[in-house]
């Protein structure tokens, strides 16, 4: 038997991610997308996964769009060590897009940290690729 859990891309058009679990204990994640939109939607990027990333054997990436690939750095940071299956063009594009997204997030975090310090809220932590 196979169980499919929709983790994103439902109720919103971003954050595409589906967990497929077999009765033999195999776990495959299809896409690992970033939630985009308003503040309330984007806060979902920092919520608990609902599964242990260390237990995922394979990430199957359908394409490079950030709403399908943007949380890969967080997945790795949180313990994913499995293989990633995707097409060569998607792998190439993801390398470029995720590095660019990391740079933008660093700039956003620096701005937010300066703002937080002025308001006594402290620094933000980044997920490094």
Predicted regions and their residues:
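Extreme N-terminal starter segment of soluble prokaryotic enzymes
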Residues: 1-3
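Short Gly/Pro-enriched turn/cap motifs at secondary-structure boundaries
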Residues: 8-10
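Pre-active-site segment of Zn-dependent metallo-hydrolases
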Residues: 12, 22-61, 65-82, 86, ...
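Residue-level marker for the onset of beta-strands and adjacent loop->beta junctions
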Residues: 14-16
């Amino acid at each position: 038997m196979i169980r499919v859990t929709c983790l994103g891309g439902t109720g919103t058009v971003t954050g595409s991610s589906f967990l497929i679990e077999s009765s033999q204990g195999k776990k495959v994640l299809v896409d690992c997308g970033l939630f985009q939109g308003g503040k309330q939607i984007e806060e979902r990027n920092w919520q608990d996964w609902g599964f242990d990333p260390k237990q995922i054997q394979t990430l199957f990436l359908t394409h490079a769009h950030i709403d399908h690939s943007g949380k890969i750095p967080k997945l790795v940071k949180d313990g994913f060590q499995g293989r990633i299956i995707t097409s060569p063009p998607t792998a190439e594009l993801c390398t470029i897009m995720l590095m660019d997204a990391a740079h933008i997030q660093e700039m956003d975090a620096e701005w937010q940290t300066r703002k937080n310090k002025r308001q006594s809220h402290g620094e933000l932590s980044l997920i490094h690729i």
